[in-house]
Swiss-Prot record:
Tissue localization of expression: Ubiquitous (at protein level). Higher levels in root hairs, stomata, epidermal cells, and hydathodes. Concentrated at the infection site of infected plants, including papillae and haustoria. Accumulates at the periphery of lateral root cap and root epidermal cells, especially in the outer lateral membrane domain facing the environment.
Outcome, altering L704F: In pen3-5; slight overaccumulation in leaves of 4-O-beta-D-glucosyl-indol-3-yl formamide (4OGlcI3F) upon Blumeria graminis conidiospore inoculation, a pathogen-inducible tryptophan-derived compound, which biosynthesis is dependent on the PEN2 metabolic pathway
Source species: Arabidopsis thaliana
Keywords from the named record: Acetylation, ATP-binding, Auxin signaling pathway, Cell membrane, Detoxification, Endoplasmic reticulum, Golgi apparatus, Hypersensitive response, Membrane, Nucleotide-binding, Phosphoprotein, Plant defense, Repeat, Stress response, Transmembrane, Transmembrane helix, Transport
TM segment ranges: 540-560, 575-595, 621-641, 659-679, 685-705, 713-733, 772-792, 1216-1236, 1239-1259, 1299-1319, 1326-1346, 1356-1376, 1384-1404, 1441-1461
Membrane topology label: Multi-pass membrane protein
Biological processes per GO annotation: auxin polar transport; auxin-activated signaling pathway; cadmium ion transport; cellular detoxification; cellular response to indolebutyric acid stimulus; cotyledon development; coumarin metabolic process; defense response by callose deposition in cell wall
Subunit-structure text: Interacts, in a Ca(2+)-dependent manner, with calmodulins CaM3, CaM7 and several CaM-like proteins (CML8, CML9, CML12/CAL4, CML37 and CML38), as well as with calcium regulated proteins CBL4/SOS3 and KIC.
Its job: Together with ABCG37, regulates auxin homeostasis and responses by playing a dual role in coumarin (e.g. esculin) and in the auxin precursor indole 3-butyric acid (IBA) efflux transport, thus influencing cotyledons, roots and root hairs development. Mediates the transport (export into the apoplast) of distinct indole-type metabolites in distinct biological processes; a precursor of 4-O-beta-D-glucosyl-indol-3-yl formamide (4OGlcI3F), a pathogen-inducible tryptophan-derived compound (e.g.
Name used for this protein in its record: ABC transporter G family member 36
Region entry Disordered, spans: 806-852
Keyword check for NAD: no
């Protein structure tokens, strides 16, 4: 590292080390004297001398030891002299959790203040010895990015469109172009510079290209995009260094391992990213200080040395990052995911930021990092980042959606992007001047950032026009961009870009040229530790698998019980082979669960891989190696339970040989399924790919169809099937035992019984085939793991693209044509220069709403209702993590005696810092909590709240926008309206109401857009948020709860949403919103405020007043609370003034002050008044629980499910392709064997073919339907809680939707298999084949749906379903015929659905065949009809009961699905 070591040493040459140390110690002492002033100077002098000696000793250490050894200050209590600051020598690589926490608590009491102090000291230390820090300047010149995409209806993912797209892509590969795609220009010829040491804010409306610009600068653009122009770092092109290691892109999507804690997540990130140049900097710094005789301050030295310590599992930098991001309070809480409670959304967003800033990277591109955070937390985080940028000369470009004015003022430079063009880039101080030159001015009580995001929009621009000399005309973005170039800031930027960056000026340590900054050994160790941790957290998964295999082993051992087994003839040997075969298959299937686990982990892996945390092999190797112990355990369990119980060859050597094969089968299967997961990458495709692969190795393993019978065109596949070797090895190991080889096949035969059996199964006779099998399985395991690693390395996640349906579509047509939309957008054009939302106050709400026009769409009648609640408390069971830390209480209280009221026509804001209990309170009041303990009184207009009736008159907009992904925006609203509006409202009226609500929230241009999955496809975050609100508004509720309706929105979108909310309130509805970081105008759109502090306590409840004067006056009335600065956001000031830091500073508890205030007494009186019903009022009553009757609910649910299924090609198309592939495989492998009736073996092969087809198509149907049902179930929980419908109509509609798709699947499957296998072409036989296949596929599908309804998530459903695959297989009648099943298990044969399927298929095809066939073991020849009756127990006249039972299984599984959907709720809130 180039730190100019040839500079002359600083300081006088004759200064002694001892004197230098003394000076420095006395300097350090003065700095800490304020804190520890109680100690005497005499004692402090002694301490100084001791400390000086310690520093002298450290200076004498070898460099390696010296750079990891320092002094740590600690407070020591002394009875004589009081608290003393003592120092102890520590090794920074061995700091324990307590030491790290003490240091952080002592040095960083108030995060932003102490952060600046320590960083200033750190910078002064570096500057003192003349070291220049490495910096990065990022330039982009003439950058243009384009994408090709489908538009309109062609962009919808219907089955038809997907088939067309696949066909066009295939033709495109051979040069035939049919596809007509639109070209979208995302960024258009933009140029600029991101400078080090300056905070740069990226602003722009949604879809303006902000994320694309950040990704481009970070070198992470999708390769399918067309890019032109140059991006350079310090003059280097992106291909000349490693941009993904030099810079870090912090995504707006939060992808984390849900079962890791916050601290574990950041520690792992810190280990993978390493320390970068910190160690080299420290080394050079220490050398120069030693030469100059300079002694560092202890806290700075410890911080720098701990930050530069490589290979530590728990880094001090992690504790520092947790502190400055405000995550220290939840550091030991798991992050959580969709189905597992963890940290809040805002905290999760901070974890995403912390994951990157914990590393050494100083060039950060941060994408909307404040979503879900309150404004004071955002300010604190941005303030700390600003200090890092200014004092460490970092390079930061950050996009924020709604930066408060005080946060906006922290930035030095602004980049404003709109429609893919740069409108302005330069100093913050000049940006308003630029727009004033056009005639636009930012109003006084309007945040500059909000103004900037609205002023370029056609719908919002006019209200800011202030030029009285000329009339307003719309100024397009292109004109702003053009005029910027001639503006003095733009000219300066152009001049700067005209001079190329001088590479010699750049520090060579600024850029990273190595792909990984940590040694491969250390990366492997980090991934190993993480994998081991995840195994411990996933203990249930491994215990479940082991218990599952023990249960199946117990069933198997009692089914093939040794007392019932003989070794007399070939028939007996076949039973042993059946047991071996089942054991092989069950241990193969055991690996199937690995696939679901791996698919769920891939998104986080791809993120970390692309951030160059670690190479793929360091992920795959620990996964493989740590899977070995669980395989040994499961294999041992299987062998111990089955081997001697069944009565296999009693030699100990054969026991251990079979154990080795079973273990290798498990390892091979787990490796194979991990490979399939990494290649397929989504659960639906992986389930199909897994089943298809399993079918291939299953069919061609030599046991369903002996080697000699396999058609020539499939002969090669026999040798590449792992099960070939597994089967050969198992059979050879058993059949070469003396008990088989010491007997003749029959009394008149010269062939040994074992040899005869091997001949019949076409297995090789050589003993060495056992070791060939072992070697082959080892090779397959190694091969699959290598391919798994390669797939992880080179394949990218399967991303779906949204169709191009521009938000500003046909804007010219909109202007002047749609008065309602124009009035909503401008909120009265006559008030130019004023803030529309700010004017929507208590006194002028009706005036500012623009008259009745704005209320169009909210005119359906409703009853205004008030809600009052008194002394509401909420408890949950004490989390295990807290009990582990010594907390003795059994319950954790989240709400502490909350009292208040929400009234009609009054818009109430529910505010507080993250973790204050805002969402918890709303969930409790709305009746959305599924667990915990609620106390207190909640009333609706004086009557006790009854949840069933309350759901009919209330709406709840959740913080997470949960919608069915495959329907359009308009369809989502139609569905909500038709189910929730009263029956008396006609269809036309409902449709009109839906259209009006769409206009109200400005979704009309997106009416035909697919909703999609968040972060994957479909609507953007802000569009999804507006849809959530619209879905509730179309229900026409009296009371509406909105959980952070503006979170994740930019200022313009937030204003649109709040206009819709305000219009809703002005109709007389009761509306309550939790809100995190409101701008001034949005905050002052509210009428009343309920403010909460952490711990679930109210600290203010009352009116805001004009310009928020009432809430400001309330807090300013307390002694010590500073006055609000001029033009400061009152929401931010209020949160700061009442923060925990402020309470500590003032030594007050604002909750206690509120409880003692007159305001609290007035609220108590109001609640008391509202708790008594008005005279003559009656309680809420509805004749029925739901708006629609059961038939109406069913029709609506079926309508939505139909569209969902039609637009789910990754489900329906994938299973259709799988069934087609299975049909062709079965047909080509068992080509025309249906007509072979010479011996019993031919019949066994046919049964094997039909059994395999039904099992594999059925299992595929089961596994592919699970993700579909799981996604829709999450939506179902929201819709049922909203009172849309009951569970039964929903469940029956989903069951009904499967019928036509399974019918299509069955018809073409039957035609292909029936013809290619060569069954008899008789109408009756073909009908029964189709009938049995149809109901078999159907019951498998419903079985998959049932398993999801019984379990909390898809992963557990997959494991649960697979638990019964083995039992269904075992009792199917293939491995052990019914007459051979012991009497104590025969009952299960009759309740096994697969057994009835095999029964029906065989009887329908062979029950009337009188052809005589040769029977094994020298028995007399029988007719086919007699043979299947004697050997399998299949009676030809039993087809009627078979048909009835198959229908019964189908109905039973569907019923259990519906019943569980109705009764079980796995959502934890």
């Amino acid at each position: 590292m180039d730190y100019n070591p040839n500079l002359p040493p600083l300081g006088g040459g004759g200064v002694s080390m001892r004197r230098s140390i003394s000076r420095s110690v006395s300097r350090a002492s003065r700095n800490i004297e304020d804190i520890f002033s109680s100690g005497s100077r005499r004692t402090q002098s002694v301490n100084d001398d001791e400390e000086a000696l310690k520093w002298a000793a450290i200076e004498k250490l070898p460099t390696y030891s010296r750079l990891r050894t320092t002094l740590m200050n600690a407070v020591v209590e002394d009875d004589v002299y009081g608290n003393q600051l003592m120092s102890k020598e520590v090794d920074v690589t061995k700091l324990d959790g307590e030491d790290r926490q003490k240091f952080i608590d002592m040095v960083f009491k108030v995060a932003e203040q102490d952060n600046e102090r320590i960083l200033t000291k750190l910078r002064n230390r570096i500057d003192r010895v003349g070291i220049k820090l490495p910096t990065v300047e990022v330039r982009y010149e003439h950058l243009t990015i384009k994408a090709d995409c489908y538009t309109g209806n062609r962009s919808l993912p219907t089955l038809l469109n997907v088939v067309r797209n696949m066909g066009e892509s295939a033709l495109g590969m051979i040069g035939i172009q049919f596809a007509k795609k639109a070209q979208l220009t995302i960024l258009k010829d933009i140029s600029g510079v991101i400078k080090p040491g300056r905070m740069t804010l990226l602003l722009g409306p949604p879809s303006s290209g902000k994320t694309t610009l950040l990704l481009a600068l970070a070198g992470k653009l999708d390769k399918s995009l067309q890019v032109s122009g140059d991006i350079t770092y310090n003059g280097y092109q992106l291909d000349e260094f490693v941009p993904r290691k030099t810079s870090a892109y912090i995504s707006q999507n939060d992808l984390h391992v849900g079962i890791m804690t916050v601290k574990e997540t950041l520690d792992f990130s810190a280990r993978c990213q390493g320390v970068g140049t910190r160690y080299d900097l420290l080394n050079e710094l220490a050398r120069r200080e030693k030469d100059a005789g300079i002694f560092p301050e202890a806290d700075v030295d410890l911080f720098m040395k701990a930050s530069a310590a490589q290979g530590v599992k728990n880094s001090l930098v992690t504790d520092y990052t947790l502190k400055i991001l405000g995550l220290d309070i939840c550091k030991d809480t798991i992050v959580g995911d969709d189905m597992m409670r963890g940290i809040s959304g805002g905290q999760k967003k901070r974890v995403t930021t912390g994951e990157m800033i914990v590393g050494p990277t100083k060039t950060l591109f941060m994408d909307e990092i404040s979503t879900g955070l309150d404004s004071s937390t955002t300010f604190q985080i941005v303030k700390c980042l600003q200090q890092i940028v200014h004092l460490n000369e970092a390079t930061v470009l950050m996009s924020l959606l709604q930066p408060a004015p005080e946060t906006f003022d922290l930035f030095d430079d602004i980049i404003l992007v709109s429609e893919g063009q740069i409108v302005y880039q330069g100093p913050r101080d000049n940006i308003l001047e630029f727009f004033e030159s056009f005639g636009f001015k930012c109003p006084e009580r309007k945040g500059t950032a909000d103004f900037l995001q609205e002023v370029t929009s056609k719908k919002d621009q006019e209200q800011y026009w202030v030029n009285p000399n000329r009339p307003y005309h719309y100024i397009p973005v292109s004109e702003f961009a053009s005029r910027y170039k001639s503006f003095h800031v733009g000219t300066k930027m152009s001049n700067e870009l005209a001079v190329p960056f001088d590479k010699s000026r750049g520090h060579k340590a600024a850029l990273v040229f190595d792909k990984y900054s940590v040694s491969k050994r250390e990366l492997l160790k980090s991934c190993w530790d993480k994998e081991w941790l995840l195994m411990q957290r996933n203990a249930f998964f491994y215990v479940f698998k082991t218990v599952q295999i023990v249960i199946i082993a117990a069933i198997t051992s009692t089914l093939f019980l040794r007392t019932e087994m003989n070794t007399r003839n070939e028939g007996d040997a076949n039973l042993y082979i059946g047991a071996l075969l089942f054991g092989m298959i069950i241990n193969m299937f055991n690996g199937f669960a690995e696939m679901a686990m791996m698919v769920s982990r891939l998104p986080v892996f791809y993120k970390q891989r692309d951030l160059l945390f670690y190479p793929s092999w360091t992920f795959s190797l620990p996964t493989f190696l740590l899977g070995i112990p669980s395989s040994i355990l499961e294999s041992t369990a299987w062998m111990v339970v089955t081997y001697y119980s069944i009565g296999f060859a009693p030699d100990a050597s054969r026991f251990f040989k079979q154990f080795l094969l079973v273990f290798l089968i498990q390892q091979m299967a787990a490796s194979l399924f991990r490979l399939i997961a990494s290649v397929c990458r989504t659960m639906m495709i992986a389930n199909t790919g897994g089943a298809l692969t399993l079918l291939l190795v299953f069919l061609l393993g030599g046991f369903l169809l002996p080697k000699g019978k396999i058609p020539d065109w499939w002969g090669w596949a026999y040798w590449v099937s792992p099960l070939t070797y597994a089967f050969n090895g198992l059979v050879v190991n058993e059949m070469f035992a003396p008990r088989w080889m010491n007997k003749m096949a029959s009394s008149n035969s010269t062939i040994k019984l074992g040899t005869m059996v091997l001949n019949t199964w076409d297995v090789y006779h050589q003993k060495n085939w056992y070791w060939i099998s072992v070697g082959a399985l080892l090779c397959f395991t190694a091969l699959f793991n290598i391919l798994f690693t390669l797939a992880l390395t080179y394949l990218n996640p399967l991303g779906k693209k949204a169709g191009l349906l521009p938000e500003e579509e046909n804007e010219d047509a909109d202007q002047g044509k749609d008065p309602m939309r124009r009035s909503l957008s401008t909120a009265d054009g006559n008030r130019r220069g004023e803030v529309a939302m700010g004017r929507m106050s208590r006194d002028s709400a009706a005036e500012a709403s623009g008259g009745a026009g704005n209320k169009k769409g909210m005119v359906l009648p409703f009853t205004p209702l008030a809600m009052s609640f008194d002394d509401v408390k909420y408890f949950v069971d004490m989390p295990g993590e807290m009990r582990d830390q010594g907390v003795t209480e059994t319950r954790l209280q989240l709400l502490k005696g909350v009292t208040g009221a929400f009234r009609p026509g009054v818009l109430t804001a529910l505010m507080g810092v993250s973790g204050a209990g805002k969402t918890t309170l709303m969930d409790v009041l709305a009746g959305r909590k599924t667990g915990g303990y609620i106390e207190g009184d909640v009333r609706i207009s004086g009557f006790p709240k009854v949840q069933e009736t309350f759901a009919r008159i209330s709406g709840y907009c959740e913080q997470t926008d949960i919608h069915s992904p495959q329907v359009t925006v308009r369809e989502s609203l139609i569905f909500s309206a038709f189910l929730r509006l009263p029956k008396e409202v006609g269809k036309d009226e409902k449709m009109m109401f839906v259209d009006q609500v769409m206009e109200l929230v400005e979704l009309d241009s997106l009416r035909d857009s697919i909703v999609g999955l968040p972060g994957v496809t479909g609507l953007s975050t802000e569009q999804r948020k507006r849809l959530t609100i619209a879905v509730e508004l179309v229900a026409n509720p009296s009371i509406i709860f909105m959980d952070e309706p503006t979170s994740g929105l930019d200022a313009r979108a937030a204003a649109i949403v709040m206009r819709a909310v305000r219009n809703t309130v002005d109709t007389g509805r009761t509306v309550v919103c939790t809100i995190h970081q409101p701008s001034i105008d949005i905050f002052e759109a509210f009428d009343e405020l309920m403010l909460m502090k952490r711990g679930g306590q109210v600290i203010y409840a009352g009116p805001l007043g004009q310009n928020s004067h009432k809430v400001v006056e309330y807090f300013e009335s307390f002694p010590g609370v500073s006055k609000i600065p001029e033009k400061y956001n009152p929401a931010t000031w209020m949160l700061e003034a009442s923060s925990l830091a402020a309470e500590l500073k003032l030594s007050v508890d604002f909750a206690e002050l509120y409880n003692q205030s007159a305001l609290h007494q007035r609220n108590k009186a109001l609640v008391k008044e509202l708790s008594v019903p008005p005279a003559g009022a009656s309680d809420l009553y509805f004749a029925t629980q739901f708006s629609q009757n059961t038939w109406g609910q069913f029709k609506s649910c079926l309508w939505k499910q139909w569209w969902t299924y039609w637009r789910s090609p990754d489900y329906n198309l994938v299973r259709f392709i799988f069934t087609l592939a299975t049909s062709l495989l079965i047909g080509t492998v068992f080509w025309q064997i249906g007509g072979n009736r010479s011996n019993a073996g031919d019949l066994t092969m046919v049964i094997g073919a039909l059994y395999a087809a039904i099992i594999f198509v059925g299992i595929n149907n089961c596994s592919t339907v699970q993700p579909m049902v799981a996604v829709e179930r999450t939506v179902f929980y929201r819709e049922r809680a909203a009172g849309m419908y009951s569970a039964m109509p929903y469940a029956i509609s989903q069951v009904t939707c499967e019928l036509p798709y399974v019918l299509i699947q069955t018809v073409y499957y039957s035609l292909i298999v029936y013809a290619m296998v060569g069954f008899e072409w008789k109408a009756e036989k073909f009908f029964w084949f189709v009938f049995v296949s149809y109901f078999s596929f159907l019951y498998w599908t419903y079985y998959g749906m049932m398993t999801v309804s019984l379990t909390p998530n898809q992963q557990v459903a997959s494991i649960f379903a697979s638990a019964f695959y083995g039992i269904f297989n075992l009792f199917s009648g293939f491995f052990i015929p019914r007459p051979k099943i012991p009497k104590w298990w025969i009952w299960y044969y009759w309740i096994c659905p697969v057994a009835w399927t095999v029964y029906g298929l065989i009887v329908s095809q062979y029950g009337d065949v009188e052809t005589r066939i040769q029977v094994l073991g020298g028995a007399p020849d029988l007719t086919v009809k007699q043979y299947i009756e004697d050997h399998y127990g299949f009676q030809s006249d039993f087809m009627g009961p078979v048909a009835a039972v198959l229908i019964a299984f189908t109905v039973f599984f569907a019923f259990i699905f519906a019943f569980c959907i109705r009764t079980l709720n796995f959502q934890t809130r």
